[in-house]
Amino acid sequence: MSEGGPDAQYRAYLREGRFMIQRSRSTGRYVFYPRVAAPGTGETDLEWVEASGGATVHAITVNRSREGSRNVALVDLDEGPRMMTRIEGVETVPIGTSVRARIVEEGGAPLVVFVPEGQA
């Protein structure tokens, strides 16, 4: 899959129901958010690999408004990169909670959210 830039490729994978991240062939280091070159090294040898879907909550906050509450979380993917997302099905969870990725559609576009382990 090579149509468009890395972000377009990532979104195309999500539309297929696949949570893909990049990995440097030379260092083995995983990369997220999708990029053309690896951070730190500038290597352009990034390949797409399936993410395990596992992560741990690093930080979480709850935004409250008249329309309701929604959390915003930072999770550390089991592969290493940190990702901004939200945790579905709960208002908040303790830091360190194990979560699992799920692809949902919102506003006509697929996105990755997480649910507490055991609720996946």
Task: List where the protein language model places each region.
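Short, conserved beta-turn/loop elements at beta-strand boundaries and strand-helix junctions
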Residues: 60-66, 106-107
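Short nucleic-acid-contacting surface segments enriched for D/E, G, S/T with interspersed K/R
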Residues: 89-101
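Conserved hydrophobic positions within beta-strands
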Residues: 55-57
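Short, acidic/hydrophobic/Gly-rich beta-strand patch recurrent on exposed beta strands
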Residues: 72-78, 86, 113-115
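Flexible extramembrane loops and terminal tails that flank transmembrane helices
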Residues: 1-18, 110-113
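OB-fold/S1-family single-stranded nucleic acid-binding modules
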Residues: 104-120
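Beta-strand/loop nucleic-acid-binding surfaces
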Residues: 81-91
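Cys/His-rich short segments
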Residues: 14-52
